[in-house]
């Protein structure tokens, strides 16, 4: 596939690095990026320096015969104009744009169509991050929750702790503990090293476990791996940006929400838009303010400003003063592994969340959803099976008969309204939504090839 990526920031470069290793022809365009030459030398891709909204630059980048244009510059307006150019001048078949401005998003149905601004898929990082955070709050104790198949199937990452019924026992004991609930353990990380899950594997405290199940069973299964936490009811948010506002808006009807914003004008505006949230104009590093607002009774402290260092420091302070959980928004991916799992419980990366959404539109085959896991190392894909026993490599075959590379696990599938956890004897049928776990994203081309029907399939 020939793909043009506009914007060589964190998202653009990470997307290029993900796709270039999957036998794609990648061209990266940016106006001024010191990384361009380095990226070209490091990876098998082409770079073009110039304005991403310039017809000449797009022509030089090969827009005339590109299969896909992905506009992820820092400017919504440049992204929109670039997609317009791709549609009007070059007939680029598929156009994806990152749009951040909430005013544009509120009018998306009227604005973004082929009669107006021709964008096929919108990516809104702020909305995606808001979704991610609210999922984590809905499942206290989870490190990551990703939904698939119309939210019927979920992949969940948790830490095993003493108090979980399965801790100290073999995985095979799960069926004895919960005979009416099915799930599959996809991976175990122990002391940072992966362990292949087997029935005889003993679950140890501190293990990071990734499992797949019907969404309705998440909490029951988490209770086997750790002592279930009470629902979060008291939430304190730091920051007044779109993410902080979005999270407060979603939570204020079900939780007691307090929000701290340093800028007085922004605090006033937020107070008017969030009638059930208590908004403070103040500094989250002010210990007196935190004490006055009973930080020791806060269930989860969310540091969601645009400043990584400020987020980290305020979360560390909040935990020291008694907050039960701390979650931070982190822009720099390098920071995440340094801080998560220590004093700070969860770090959320807008870049990784955005990359997941982009990959769902870029992957070959009938891919419906993608989630990056373990901060970009692993991946989960929801893909639809097409064809029949004569035209497909998988339809009509038992899962146990498929020759899957090491590290690829078929976890579950949705057939009609039924969630089926993958077992060796399950036969894949046409139209099944299949959720696959890849411990190494380098195996993505193998999955795309496996699910591609033959040329005779109509």
UniProtKB/Swiss-Prot annotation:
Entry-linked SUPFAM superfamilies: NAD(P)-binding Rossmann-fold domains, TrkA C-terminal domain-like
Gene Ontology terms for molecular function: potassium ion transmembrane transporter activity
Domain RCK N-terminal as annotated: residue spans: 1-123, 232-348
Keywords for the protein's UniProt record, in alphabetical order: Ion transport, NAD, Potassium, Potassium transport, Repeat, Transport
RCK C-terminal domain ranges (all copies): 143-227, 368-453
Pfam family, one: TrkA_N
Entry binding sites for NAD(+) 1: 7-11, 30, 73-74, 98
Domain of life of the organism encoding this protein: Bacteria
InterPro entries, sorted: K_uptake_TrkA (IPR006036), NAD(P)-bd_dom_sf (IPR036291), RCK_C (IPR006037), RCK_C_sf (IPR036721), RCK_N (IPR003148), Trk_Ktr_HKT_K-transport (IPR050721)
GO-annotated cellular components: plasma membrane
Residues noted as binding NAD(+) 2 in the record, renumbered to the chain: 234-262
Alphabetical GO biological process terms: potassium ion transport
Domain remark in the UniProt entry: The RCK N-terminal domain binds NAD and possibly other effectors. This is expected to cause a conformation change that regulates potassium transport.
Name of protein: Trk system potassium uptake protein TrkA
Protein species of origin: Haemophilus influenzae (strain ATCC 51907 / DSM 11121 / KW20 / Rd)
């Amino acid at each position: 596939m020939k793909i043009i990526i506009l914007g060589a920031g964190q998202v653009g470069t990470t997307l290029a690095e993900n796709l270039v290793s999957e036998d794609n022809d990648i061209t990266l365009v940016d106006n001024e990026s010191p990384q361009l030459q380095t990226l070209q030398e490091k990876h098998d891709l082409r770079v073009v320096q110039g304005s991403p909204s310039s017809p000449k630059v797009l022509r030089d980048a090969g827009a005339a015969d590109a299969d896909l244009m992905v506009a992820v510059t820092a400017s919504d307006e440049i992204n929109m104009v670039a997609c317009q150019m791709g549609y009007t001048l070059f007939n680029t078949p598929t156009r994806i744009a990152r749009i951040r401005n909430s005013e544009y998003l509120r009018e998306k149905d009227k604005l973004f169509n082929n009669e107006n601004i021709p964008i096929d898929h919108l990516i809104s990082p702020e909305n995606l991050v808001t979704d991610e955070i609210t999922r984590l709050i809905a499942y206290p104790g989870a490190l990551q929750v990703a939904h698939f198949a119309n939210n019927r199937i979920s992949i969940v990452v948790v830490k095993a702790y003493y108090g979980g019924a399965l801790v100290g026992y073999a995985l095979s004991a799960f069926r004895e503990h919960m005979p009416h609930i099915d799930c599959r353990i996809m991976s175990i990380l122990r002391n940072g090293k992966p362990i292949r899950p087997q029935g005889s594997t003993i679950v140890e405290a501190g293990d990071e476990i990734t499992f797949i199940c019907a969404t309705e069973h998440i909490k029951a299964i988490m209770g086997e791996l750790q002592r279930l936490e009470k629902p979060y009811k008291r939430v304190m948010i730091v920051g007044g940006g779109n993410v902080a506002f979005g999270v407060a808006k979603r939570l204020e009807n079900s939780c007691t929400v307090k929000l701290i914003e340093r800028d007085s004008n922004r605090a006033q505006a937020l107070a008017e838009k969030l009638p059930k949230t208590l908004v403070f104009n103040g500094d989250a590093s002010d210990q007196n303010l935190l004490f006055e607002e009973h930080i020791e009774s806060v269930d989860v402290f969310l540091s969601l400003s645009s400043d990584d260092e400020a987020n980290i420091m305020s979360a560390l302070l909040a935990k020291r003063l008694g907050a039960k959980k701390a979650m931070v928004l982190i822009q720099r991916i390098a920071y995440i592994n340094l801080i998560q799992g220590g004093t700070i419980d969860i770090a959320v990366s807008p870049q990784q969340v955005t990359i997941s959404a982009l990959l769902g539109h870029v992957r070959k085959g009938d891919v419906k959803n993608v989630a990056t896991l373990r901060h970009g190392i692993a991946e989960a894909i929801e893909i639809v099976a097409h064809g029949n026993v004569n035209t497909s490599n998988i339809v009509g075959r038992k899962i146990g008969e498929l020759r899957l590379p090491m590290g690829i696990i078929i976890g579950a599938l949705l057939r009609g309204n039924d969630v089926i956890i993958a077992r060796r004897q399950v036969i894949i049928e046409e139209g099944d939504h299949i959720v696959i776990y890849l411990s190494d994203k380098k195996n993505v081309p193998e999955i795309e090839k496996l699910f591609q029907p033959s040329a005779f399939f109509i």
